[in-house]
Amino acid sequence: MESLNGCVLSQLRQSGAQLTRTLQKVQSRSYSAPVSGSIPAAKKKYVPTSGTYPLGFSASGINVGVKPKNTTKPDVCLVASDRPCAAAAVFTKNKFQAAPVTFSRSLLQKKGNQGIQGVVVNSGCANAVTGKGGLEDAGKMAQAADECFGQSESTLVMSTGVIGQRLPIEKITSNIPRAHKAMGSSHDHWLTAAKAICTTDTFPKLISRSFKLPSSPSVEYRIAGMTKGAGMIHPNMATLLGIIATDAPVSSTVLPAVLKHAVDRSFNSITIDGDTSTNDTVALLANGAAGGKEVVANTPDYDAFQTVLTDFSTDLAKLIVRDGEGATKFVTIRVVEAASEEAARKIASTIARSPLVKTALYGKDANWGRILCATGYSLVSEPGLPVNDIPEVVPEKTNVSFIPTDGTAELKLLVNGEPEQVDEARAAEILELEDLEILVRLGTGDKQATYWTCDYSHEYITINGDYRT
C-alpha cells in the first residue's frame, strides 16, 4: 500500500510540474501565438481581409492530420492554374536538401521551366533527411495532384516541419483529391491556403496587388503570394516557403533570372536566427491569363515586372521578420558608403544575426558597441587562415546611428570613429518603437545594402525548446 501511495504521489507531483510548465508557457507567450492558436492582437493588422488575385489561379487548404495531434489546422495546401504555367524556383543551399527540394528542382530542369500546373504543400513534416523513401513520397504527392489536374509531371512539391521523419504519405495522398475539390479563387480560399503552410507562424502571410506593364497600359495584371517562416530563417533561404502567382505573360526564358534578382533583394536579405533550413523554396508561376505582350529580356516590360516582383517579394519577406519567433521589434539594418555591395551585405548580415545586438534591442539597451563589434569582425578571415587586411572598414571613418521610424531626427552614436555623448532617454524612446533602423556609414565607397531582422526575446527559447513537444 505504501508503495502504491508513493507511486500516486509521484504521479501527482509530475502532473503538477507539467501544469506549472504549461502555465508558465501560456504566461510567457506575449508575442508568439497563444496556446489557443489564435492570432496575437498585435499581429492581426498584417492579415488581409480582402485581395486581388490572378486570373486562372485557385487555392485551397485542408486538414489531413500530418501531425496526429492536429485535428483542426489546415496542413495541406494546393495552389494551381487552370492552364500550364511558366515557372521558376529558388531553393536552399543547405547540403542536406529535403526530398521535395530535390524533386522540384529536377522537375523544373526536366520541363525547362514550362508546363507547370501547380504546387502541393504540406506542413507538419519536412520530409528532410528521409532517404530514398522520402524522395518517393515527394513524387507520390506530385502524382496525386497531377491526377487531379489531368496532367503529368506538372506539380511542384514543398514540405515544412520537423526534420528526419517520414511523411504519413497515404494520409496525404488520399486527401489531395479533397484539397482539389475544395479549391477556389476567393480571398478566403487563398487565406486558408496560406494558413495551411504555417508551422510556428503566428499569422498567415498573404499579399496580393495589381500592376500594369508599359506595352499593355489598358491591361490590369495581378500578382499574389503567400509565405511562411518564423524561425530557422537566414539567407540562402531558410525554413521559408513562398508561392507567388501572376497572370502576366512572362516568358519561361526570363522567369528564373527575375526571380533570383528579386529573392536576393528580399528573402535573402532577412534573418531571424542565422539558421539555414533544408527545405527553403520560393516558386513563381506565370500563366499569362490576363493577356498582353509576352515579357521577354531587354524590354521596358521586363524592367517593370522586375521592379514589381522585387517590391512584392520584399513585402512578403518583411512579414516573416515581423513574425520572428518571440520577436517584439522589426529592425532594418542599413549599411551605406561601402567599398562594395558584397562588403555591405556581409556587414549588414553579420549585424542582423548577432545575438548580442538582438538581445540588446529586446532589452532596449543602446549598446552600440555590439553593433560596432559585429561590423569589425564581419569581414575577418576564418580561424586558421592568414589574417586578412580589411580596407572596407576604416575605424576613423565609421559612423553608427539609430534612425527612428516616427520621423524624428537620427540619434548619432558614433561619428568618424569617435563615440558621441548618447542621450540615453532619447535612445530609450527610439528603442521603445516597434520599428527602428540601425544605420552604419562606412565612408569607404558608394555601395549599400539592407537587411531586415528582429530582436531575441525569452520567448524564442521557449518556442524552440518546445518545438517537438
Swiss-Prot record:
Signal peptide: none annotated. GO terms for molecular function: glutamate N-acetyltransferase activity; L-glutamate N-acetyltransferase activity. Pathway: Amino-acid biosynthesis; L-arginine biosynthesis; L-ornithine and N-acetyl-L-glutamate from L-glutamate and N(2)-acetyl-L-ornithine (cyclic): step 1/1; Amino-acid biosynthesis; L-arginine biosynthesis; N(2)-acetyl-L-ornithine from L-glutamate: step 1/4. Its main location: mitochondrion. GO terms for biological process: L-arginine biosynthetic process; ornithine biosynthetic process. Heterodimer of an alpha and a beta chain. Catalyzes two activities which are involved in the cyclic version of arginine biosynthesis: the synthesis of acetylglutamate from glutamate and acetyl-CoA, and of ornithine by transacetylation between acetylornithine and glutamate. This protein may be expected to contain an N-terminal transit peptide but none has been predicted. This is Arginine biosynthesis bifunctional protein ArgJ, mitochondrial. It comes from Sordaria macrospora (strain ATCC MYA-333 / DSM 997 / K(L3346) / K-hell).
